[in-house]
Design a protein with these regions (language model features):
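Short acidic-hydrophobic, aromatic-tinged amphipathic segments that line or gate anion-handling sites
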Residues: 11, 55-59, 156-167, 224
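Active-site/ligand-binding-proximal alpha/beta "capping" segment
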Residues: 177-232, 236
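Short, acidic/turn-prone active-site loops that include or flank metal/cofactor-
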Residues: 36, 61, 135-137, 208-209, ...
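N-terminal positively charged helical leader segments and presequences
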Residues: 1-93
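Structured adenosyl-cofactor binding patch, chiefly the S-adenosyl-L-methionine
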Residues: 18, 124, 144-149, 213-253
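RNA substrate-binding interface of SAM-dependent RNA methyltransferases
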Residues: 19, 26, 33, 93-185
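Short beta->alpha connector loops at strand-helix junctions that form conserved
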Residues: 59, 107, 133-134, 162, ...
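Short, hinge-like loop/turn segments at secondary-structure boundaries
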Residues: 73-76, 147-151, 194-198
Length: 253
């Protein structure tokens, strides 16, 4: 990749690119596709042609693999500017508090695929705001995160906090802080009793191996677990995130 394109991100995967083309075609600077995708993305090609942006039918899958660094391109690769994740501000938290918003907080989730899966679940259940930790252990947006999100990236807004601990301190008094912890006493089934229908809340999801940091855990107003049969200790964080998104959405129905 030359210097001109170093700050681009390759969005690949059929559903991810389809949602990007439908919701934010203006973000696409270049588009590459296999022959079997030409008819499906005809409108996008017309859009790009009108704006004198590059689109091209590739001759082999290897070209797409080289562009996105993955064999899982599903016949399409759209290049966009590297997304800017805005820093969280107190005014965002205050707005969520006044509007009774449900938010997710990712505390050092290290796997980009898990981040993408969490974003997909959030979009599915109508949770539009996700805060990620700015620490090195936190996964960032990658082609695989976009692909695994299956188009969900176009329906959420990401924010970055210095750490989960820093965010939870700022959120005190504005959002009910609920930590996902497999050692907690209370069950996810209690969320309707914990969160009011119009109450603003943040669900804290922790690192795949270590969970929520001890400092962040101490700042949670309540810790909640997903009870199982005991055969394994816990669910994958993306699976757990899906259940928590569902529980929070159910409260608001």
């Amino acid at each position: 990749m030359n210097e001109l394109h170093q700050k681009e991100l390759a969005v690949c995967g059929f559903e991810a690119v389809k949602a990007l083309a439908a919701q934010h075609p203006e973000k696409i600077s270049r588009f590459f596709f296999a022959g079997n995708r030409a008819r499906i993305f005809g409108d996008l090609c017309k859009y790009l042609a009108q704006r004198k942006r590059l689109y091209r039918l590739v001759q082999s899958d290897s070209e797409l693999e080289k562009l996105c660094g993955s064999i899982h391109h599903q016949g399409v690769v759209a290049m966009i500017d590297m997304p800017h994740i805005q820093d969280i501000q107190l005014q965002h938290i205050q707005k969520w508090g006044s509007e009774g918003t449900g938010v997710l907080l990712c505390d050092r989730i290290g796997n980009a695929n898990n981040l993408g899966a969490i974003i997909r679940s959030a979009a599915f259940f109508g949770i539009k705001d996700i805060v990620i930790s700015g620490e090195d252990a936190q996964a960032q947006l990658t082609p695989s995160a976009y692909r695994i999100a299956q188009g969900g990236m176009e329906f959420i807004t990401l924010y970055k906090a210095p750490s989960a601990e820093a965010f939870l301190k700022e959120a005190s008094g504005y959002l009910l802080r609920i930590g996902a912890d497999h050692r907690a006493y209370r069950s996810i089934a209690a969320i309707p009793a914990i969160v009011g229908k119009d109450e603003a809340a943040v669900i804290v999801l922790g690192n795949e191996e270590h969970g929520i940091t001890p400092a962040a855990k101490k700042l949670c107003d309540v810790l909640v677990k997903i009870p199982g049969c005991g055969a394994v200790e816990s669910l994958n964080v993306a699976q757990a995130g899906t259940l928590f998104c569902s529980a929070l959405a159910e409260v608001r129905r």
